[in-house]
């Protein structure tokens, strides 16, 4: 892009940010970070390098989220389906996620901004070193309340619902609850994190238009926005457009 083009783009971005700050933003933003591997192939780097670029982009997007006033972000970091990838890639991703958590533990912005870090999903299949790091970062940030950063790891929406049903069934057999007592509020209490509110907006990159087993129970009335760029290529202007689009919709919640 030319210098003039960059100048015009910065002005547009500034004006859009100014407009966004005048109106309510999503309280909870869900993000499906799709396109790391496609990005890598498109510029001739390894897929692992593409994942590293994706990690770097996530740091940017968290900053953008706090800048516009969003207080909760949930990122689809590693799905149950991702376990089916080649073992070398899976192990690389586990190490990359572990590094990301360690970076958070050492990042003064986490403590300055009061960022609580939480993991949702079935972590039983994760390597011990990663489970230990998750325990550390969750414990270290548990007291913070200003901003919440959730990572869905070992997560699948269908599996979450199945696991909830199994736990409910067991409690019925044990006489702890009655079938007639089951309602949406009770069901939510059996999900991986009963404190997780429904996402107001789900942003997906790469141009794919589906939610891919992400927060299936919680996303019943979420607004969806699909950005036609791979995750590492997401620009601040793309992010702001997603928020602006959300602000200009009339949410009906099924009515």
From Swiss-Prot:
Q: Which UniProt keywords apply?
A: Magnesium, Metal-binding, Transferase
Question: Which Gene Ontology MF annotations are present?
Answer: ditrans,polycis-polyprenyl diphosphate synthase [(2E,6E)-farnesyl diphosphate specific] activity; magnesium ion binding
Positions bound to Mg(2+): 34, 223
What detail does the entry give on cofactor binding?
Answer: Binds 2 magnesium ions per subunit.
Q: Which Pfam families does its entry note?
A: Prenyltransf
**Where does the record place the catalytic residues?**
34, 82
Which SUPFAM superfamilies does the annotation name?
Undecaprenyl diphosphate synthase
**The organism's place on the tree of life at top rank:** Archaea
**Enzyme nomenclature, EC number:** 2.5.1.89
Keyword Transferase found: yes
Q: Report which reactions are catalysed by this protein.
A: geranylgeranyl diphosphate + 7 isopentenyl diphosphate = tri-trans,hepta-cis-undecaprenyl diphosphate + 7 diphosphate
Q: Does the keyword Transferase apply?
A: yes
What is this protein for, i.e. what is its function?
Answer: Catalyzes the sequential condensation of isopentenyl diphosphate (IPP) with geranylgeranyl diphosphate (GGPP) to yield (2Z,6Z,10Z,14Z,18Z,22Z,26Z,30E,34E,38E)-undecaprenyl diphosphate (tritrans,heptacis-UPP). It is probably the precursor of glycosyl carrier lipids.
Q: Which family does it belong to?
A: Belongs to the UPP synthase family.
**Record's subunit section:** Homodimer.
What NCBIfam families does its record include?
uppS
- Return the protein name: Tritrans,polycis-undecaprenyl-diphosphate synthase (geranylgeranyl-diphosphate specific)
């Amino acid at each position: 892009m030319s210098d003039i083009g960059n100048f015009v783009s910065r002005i547009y971005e500034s004006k859009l940010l100014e407009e966004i700050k005048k109106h309510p933003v999503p309280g909870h933003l869900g993000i499906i970070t799709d396109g790391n591997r496609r990005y890598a192939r498109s510029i001739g780097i390894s897929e692992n390098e593409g994942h590293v670029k994706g990690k770097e982009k996530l740091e940017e997007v968290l900053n953008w989220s706090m800048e516009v006033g969003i207080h909760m972000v949930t990122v689809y970091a590693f799905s149950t389906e991702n376990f089916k990838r080649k073992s070398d890639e899976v192990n690389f991703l586990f190490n990359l996620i572990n590094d990301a958590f360690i970076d958070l533990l050492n990042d003064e912005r986490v403590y300055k901004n009061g960022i609580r870090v939480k993991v949702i999903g079935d972590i039983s299949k994760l390597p011990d070193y990663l489970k230990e790091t998750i325990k550390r970062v969750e414990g270290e940030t548990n007291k913070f309340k200003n901003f919440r950063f959730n990572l869905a790891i070992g997560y699948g929406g269908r599996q979450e619902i199945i696991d909830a049903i199994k736990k409910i069934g067991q409690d019925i057999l044990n006489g702890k609850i009655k079938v007639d007592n089951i309602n949406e509020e009770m069901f939510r209490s059996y999900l991986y994190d009963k404190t997780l509110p429904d996402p107001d907006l789900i942003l997906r990159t790469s141009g794919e238009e589906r939610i891919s087993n992400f927060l299936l129970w919680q996303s019943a009335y979420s607004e969806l926005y699909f950005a036609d760029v791979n995750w590492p290529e997401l620009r601040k202007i793309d992010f702001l457009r997603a928020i602006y689009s959300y602000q200009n919709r009339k949410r009906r919640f099924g009515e």
